[in-house]
């Protein structure tokens, strides 16, 4: 998260927790016409998977946070507040969140290039807490990426495991009588030979 997003997350986290929810992270996206402040919320880990985030949860957080932002005023200028569940392609904001998703695949965008690349996709292998880094399996190699160099990260859903993978098309079966393809004929519709 950016410094501004971290500042806002620290400010709003107690409010979200007071509603029995968890603030996973904040995206602050400044733009000329007005910024977007996006909050990702979830139910506490202990309550998953029995309980999931719903629209009512997002509305409650939006109301409470909106009131707090009006008083605290951490953002100058106009902005749009969005409150969202993380979805199946959830963003990852903290080392703890990377640890929760060990074994899953993630897409990562770096702040500074590493090995000539800024974008990686690989399986989260482990967290190196001492080095404050995440170790990924990328293209058959272990790649250690410093947490401070990660700009954005998202889980890549396993659509097959979720039962949402597109089905392969059925192989064509035998043709029904009367539905065979007609061979091009040298005759016109009237049965007369065509002039060539």
UniProtKB/Swiss-Prot annotation:
Keywords (A to Z) from UniProt: Cytoplasm, Ribosome biogenesis
Alphabetical GO biological process terms: ribosomal small subunit assembly; translation
Highest taxon above the source species: Bacteria
Chain positions covered by the region annotation Disordered: 164-196
A cellular component annotation (GO) from this entry: cytosol
Sequence ranges of Basic residues compositional bias: 173-182
Database matches in InterPro entries: Ribosome_maturation_RimP, RimP_C, RimP_C_sf, RimP_N, RimP_N_sf
Localization (cell): Cytoplasm
Listed Pfam families: DUF150_C, RimP_N
Family that this chain belongs to: Belongs to the RimP family.
Function: Required for maturation of 30S ribosomal subunits.
HAMAP family: RimP
Protein name, UniProt field: Ribosome maturation factor RimP
């Amino acid at each position: 998260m950016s410094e501004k997003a971290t500042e806002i997350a620290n400010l709003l986290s107690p409010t979200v927790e007071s509603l029995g929810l968890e603030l996973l992270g904040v995206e602050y996206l400044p733009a000329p016409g007005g910024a977007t402040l996006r909050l990702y919320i979830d139910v506490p880990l202990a309550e998953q998977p029995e309980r999931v985030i719903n629209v009512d949860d997002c509305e409650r957080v939006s109301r409470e946070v909106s009131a707090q932002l009006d008083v605290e005023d951490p953002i100058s200028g106009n902005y749009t507040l969005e409150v969202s569940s993380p979805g199946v392609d959830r963003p990852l904001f903290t080392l703890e969140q990377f640890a929760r998703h060990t074994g899953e695949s993630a897409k990562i965008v770096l702040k500074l290039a590493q090995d000539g690349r800024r974008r990686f996709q690989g399986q989260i292998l482990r967290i190196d807490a001492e080095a404050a880094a995440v170790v990924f399996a990328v293209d058959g190699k272990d790649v250690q990426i410093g947490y401070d160099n990660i700009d954005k990260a998202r889980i890549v859903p396993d659509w097959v495991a979720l039962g949402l993978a597109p089905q392969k098309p059925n192989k064509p079966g035998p043709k029904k009588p009367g539905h065979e393809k007609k061979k091009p004929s040298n005759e016109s519709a009237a049965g007369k030979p065509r002039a060539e």
